[in-house]
Amino acid sequence: MSSLAFNYIVNLLSRREYSEFELRNKMQEKNFSEEEIDDALSLCQAKNWQSDRRFSENYLNSRSQKGCGVGRIRQELRQLKGVSSDIIDEVLMESEIDWYEMAENLLRKKFPNYNEQQTSKMKQKIWQYMLSHGFRSDEFADLIGQNQSEWD
């Protein structure tokens, strides 16, 4: 194994968590061979310095605090970070995040003057906003029907 490859990964991991996929991409950009990449990653994983599960847990907490719903987080982890669906499912299942409450808080913050007498155009805008942030319709649909006094 190349100590240069190992040192490169350790240097990256000393700053923040990375998924295996991200580390592979960074090492390929630096022209490390597949063997060097595999060896360095295996050693870091054996020492528990790199873990896709731990990365996913941290990513979930970080993105949920920024108002992202489960759908968006799942998509980002899978497509952008290369985390396996099995790990994502486990992390989401074990998460103690109340997605309904999060959707309600996001809705209150973004649309503070909303009430149930709003036009269908406004309701459509809210619907699109919530879906684009990764919330499922069942997590916010009944919130749109609540009136402002129930939000206070």
Swiss-Prot record:
Output the Gene3D superfamilies linked to this UniProt entry: Winged helix-like DNA-binding domain superfamily/Winged helix DNA-binding domain
Write out the annotated subcellular location: Cytoplasm
Record InterPro entries? RecX_HTH_1st, RecX_HTH_2nd, RecX_HTH_3rd, Regulatory_RecX, WH-like_DNA-bd_sf
One GO BP annotation is: regulation of DNA repair
Q: Name one GO cellular component term.
A: cytoplasm
Which of UniProt's keywords are assigned here? Cytoplasm
Quote the Pfam families the UniProt record gives.
RecX_HTH1, RecX_HTH2, RecX_HTH3
Q: Which family does it belong to?
A: Belongs to the RecX family.
Q: What does this protein do?
A: Modulates RecA activity.
- Name of protein: Regulatory protein RecX
Q: Which organism is it from?
A: Haemophilus influenzae (strain 86-028NP)
Give the gene name: recX
